[in-house]
Amino acid sequence: MFDSKNLVNPHLAGDSFFEKRSSKGILLLHGLTATTNSVRPLASRLGKLDWTISAPLLHGHGESLEKLSTTNWRDWATQVEQCWHQLNDHCDESFIAGESAGGLLALWLACLQTIRPKGVVLVAPALQLNLPDWKRQLIWLLSFFKSTFPKENKSVDLQWQGYSEHSLKAVLQLIDLQDLVLEIIPQLEQDILVVEGGQDDVIGPGVSTLLQKKAKGSEVKSIFVEKAGHHPMLERTSQDYVLPEIVNFLQKS
């Protein structure tokens, strides 16, 4: 259990976990300000199919916003890389799935690692934020004067776990990672599944179209769920459809 002063739904399970089973495995990556709670529904389904699961709690998460503000995207990437090698020490076939910022880290890893994932699942990937340029500039300016700003929707009813506020510096790190990933996407060679929600107010529309244009070496499959928001794997309106589709993609890849 985490510190209730920092997190929404601190009673939920959100720590790192590694579940060693068969030689088929997957690395699951949560989003910015979240915890591993957001990927546990998928982990549960794959675990029943005897998959090995690795799900790290990214640096600066599950502790405090102050701690998150001292981390950068390279800290997260290094941690993800270490977990990827650990997974591949045990597995013959390895995949990766990421939600939101975790999707960016999944793309970074898929492009640059010598041992590349057999398939990539991106759930509401933060490739393009629903954030105009003037807001980006405002975030950069505000980061010199304050460290956090509140979220409009704290997701209490969603069974989502994470910080109730944004770290301005962490958002800027996310944008830096986003810019890098957009440059290296043409290096992708794996099959990709993209899950997008029609009610997602965080991610800009057309992520799957963007990937299809840039990742010409990959086959990109898209699932669009009109009623889904930014957390399709947790939302009751979408999870019963989205989770089986993800599992089906992974089993066939």
Please give the residue ranges for each predicted region:
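The serine-hydrolase catalytic nucleophile loop
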Residues: 33-43
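Conserved alpha/beta-hydrolase
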Residues: 47-65
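Gly/Ala-rich beta-loop-alpha elbow adjacent to hydrolase catalytic centers
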Residues: 98-102, 106
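Active-site nucleophile loop of the alpha/beta-hydrolase fold
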Residues: 121-130
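Active-site nucleophile elbow and catalytic-triad environment of alpha/beta-hydrolase enzymes
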Residues: 167-185
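Short beta-strand/loop motif that positions the catalytic acidic residue
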Residues: 188, 194-196, 200
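Conserved alpha/beta-hydrolase "acid-adjacent" motif
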Residues: 201-207
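Catalytic histidine-centered segment of alpha/beta-hydrolase-like enzymes
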Residues: 228-239
